């Protein structure tokens, strides 16, 4: 009773609150993703013929979002094998000598600068100037023929055999080792030739199984002015 005016209830107290926490469970550490970026960078040191296949395997592994130690180990082994093959080929590159009396020898620095700076180079010169025999040697000196062969086409079989023999002789190598040739019914190439002479028809036929001709890092189309059907297809 307060002042006779009625009952007044005491202010209700707030209910007690309790904080309930569950025991903390440590979040399992997510396994680290394999370092694919460094493996993609290693492709530059592989054979051209291996790069596309290995890049596709790495891309599939990256896009899957999963860790596959077995596949990663297989890719690493393939990268190592391809890089070792490149190193072995580089160690076999000879130091070429050039006959001083040939016009191509006199202009070799100019030609090499053009080869270094441009994807496609047209070399014109008189018959006997040394284009056919010296261009592959110029390419070898630039470091070509290592990640793939230097392909060198001739319009006729006899020319392919003769030129291969001459270049091999100038490099001081038995025919079929550093320099080989392939014509119809006859293949004289060792396991790891740096330069391969062939008819233009042979090279064109290889596009069936190697559409981008990744077996080669350089291709020389000799006698291109003859403009045969095979040569036109190759240039295209």
Predicted regions and their residues:
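Hydrophobic transmembrane signal anchors and adjacent membrane-proximal interface regions, especially
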Residues: 7-10, 43-46, 156
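Coiled-coil-like amphipathic alpha-helices with heptad-repeat character
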Residues: 3, 25-28, 171
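Conserved P-loop/Walker A NTP-binding site and adjacent catalytic elements of P-loop NTPases
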Residues: 114, 121-236
């Amino acid at each position: 009773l307060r002042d006779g005016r009625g009952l007044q209830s005491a202010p209700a107290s707030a209910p007690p609150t309790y904080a309930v926490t569950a025991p903390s469970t440590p979040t399992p550490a997510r396994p680290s993703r394999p370092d694919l970026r460094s493996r993609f960078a290693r492709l530059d040191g592989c054979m051209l013929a291996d790069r596309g296949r290995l890049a596709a395997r790495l891309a599939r592994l990256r896009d899957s979002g999963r860790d596959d130690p077995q596949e990663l180990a297989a890719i690493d082994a393939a990268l190592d094998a391809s890089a070792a093959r490149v190193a072995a080929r580089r160690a076999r590159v000879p130091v070429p000598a050039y006959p001083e009396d040939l016009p191509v020898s006199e202009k070799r620095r100019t030609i090499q600068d053009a080869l270094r700076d441009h994807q496609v180079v047209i070399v014109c010169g008189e018959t006997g100037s040394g284009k056919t025999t010296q261009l592959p040697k110029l390419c070898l000196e630039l470091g070509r023929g290592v990640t793939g062969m230097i392909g060198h086409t001739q319009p006729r079989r006899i020319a392919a055999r003769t030129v291969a023999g001459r270049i091999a002789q100038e490099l001081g190598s038995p025919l079929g080792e550093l320099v080989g040739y392939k014509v119809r019914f006859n293949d004289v190439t060792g396991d790891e030739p740096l330069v391969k002479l062939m008819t233009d028809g042979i090279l064109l036929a290889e596009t069936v199984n190697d559409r981008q001709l990744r077996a080669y890092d350089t291709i020389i189309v000799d006698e291109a002015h003859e403009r045969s059907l095979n040569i036109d297809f190759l240039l295209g």
